[in-house]
Regions:
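Alpha-helical transmembrane segments and their helix-start/interface "positive-inside/aromatic belt" motifs
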Residues: 13-16, 76-93, 162-176, 252-265
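Membrane-entry segments of alpha-helical transmembrane domains in multi-pass membrane proteins
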Residues: 1-12, 27, 76-88, 121-138, ...
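Juxtamembrane boundary at the C-terminal end of a transmembrane helix
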Residues: 270-283
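Long, well-ordered mid-to-C-terminal structural blocks that present hydrophobic/aromatic surfaces
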Residues: 95, 99-190
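Transmembrane-helix bundle segments that line or gate the permeation/cavity pathway
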Residues: 1-66, 99, 229, 271
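Loop-to-transmembrane boundary segments
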Residues: 31, 43-93, 215-225
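Hydrophobic alpha-helical transmembrane segments and adjacent short intramembrane/lumenal linkers
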Residues: 169-244, 249, 256, 263
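Membrane-interfacial helical/loop segments at transmembrane boundaries in membrane proteins
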Residues: 106-122, 193-214, 282-283
Length: 283
């Protein structure tokens, strides 16, 4: 922070802030500033009304700023474009959560056993094996997005970089809902033990008989997860169409331009649903 400035570091270097602000574009609330106090510290743009910039919001007078409701996902097209590497970051978020879910399945356990039997070195370096496999999945997701961004960018008369910057935010709904869906099971199950953790914070067995108490069926949890993923996919496709319409006045032309991206979104969504449908590992 001392070297680059507080806001620059938070926007580009502090991981948790970057993740939180990325997912905030999907939120139903937005910060807005009617009359900015000066140039944006985060270099998010110089629009007359600035949306989604905490630095500009804090710097503005109280009468010139506010918080308002908005439709879920509308921040994808209302807020400024993502910074350098923003597209790769969003795709990496999605890929790492999908991979984390895959590592808990029986198929991953079978794959791991198959590899370890044939390459003993990986068996002795299990963490390195998992890291390399995760990087491979992330690279595959990013390469697929880069290829599609190139196609879409050329169809719009621009470059692959332009396509990536414009359409990367449209993947945030898919990444966001899969993130929530992935950890929803932990919330439902482990959340039932919150009272026991509060009553026994040091693990002294003061609450030895803590057990699940909600009785929520696993099928209900699974269907909620599926519904979340499908909902996020629908919002992502809708927002991609709105982004396409910003440069294509003809509705049909906008559909043609975004078609490769929609196919990629279907592939990303299918990968999440496929992982969700796998049998969990007994380990």
């Amino acid at each position: 922070m001392a070297a680059f400035g507080t806001e620059t570091w938070l926007v580009r270097g502090e991981l948790f802030t970057v993740v939180a602000r990325t997912f905030a574009r999907f939120a139903p609330l937005e910060l807005y500033v009617r009359r900015p106090a000066g140039p944006c510290p985060a270099e998010a743009g110089d629009d007359p009304e600035r949306i989604g910039c905490p630095a500009c919001w804090l710097a503005a007078d109280r009468g010139d700023r506010g918080i308002r409701l908005r439709p879920y996902g509308s921040g994808v097209h209302r807020e400024p474009a993502l910074g350098p590497g923003g597209g790769a970051f969003v795709v990496a978020l999605l890929a790492t959560v999908v991979f984390d879910g895959f590592t808990q399945t029986q198929r991953y356990a079978d794959l791991e056993g198959f590899v370890f039997q044939r390459v003993g070195w990986f068996g002795a370096h299990e963490t390195l094996y998992g890291t390399l496999l995760m990087l491979g999945v992330v690279a595959l997701f990013i390469l697929a997005f880069a290829a599609v961004a190139g196609i879409v960018g050329r169809r719009e008369g621009g470059t692959a970089m332009n396509g990536a910057r414009r359409y990367a935010p449209t993947l945030i709904p898919i990444a966001g809902v899969y993130f929530v869906s992935h950890y929803f099971l932990y919330l439902v199950y482990a959340g039932q033990f919150t009272w026991a953790a509060v009553a026994d914070p040091f693990g002294r067995e003061w609450v030895p008989d803590a057990e699940p108490w909600t009785g929520m069926p696993g099928a209900v949890v699974w269907w909620i997860q599926v519904a979340l993923i499908v909902w996020g996919h629908v919002i992502a496709v809708f927002e991609a169409h709105r982004v396409a319409q910003a440069t294509q006045r003809d509705h049909r032309r906008a559909v043609v331009v975004q078609a490769p991206l929609v196919i990629l979104m279907v592939a990303y969504t299918f990968s999440g649903l496929w992982v969700l449908g796998q049998v969990l590992s007994q380990a």
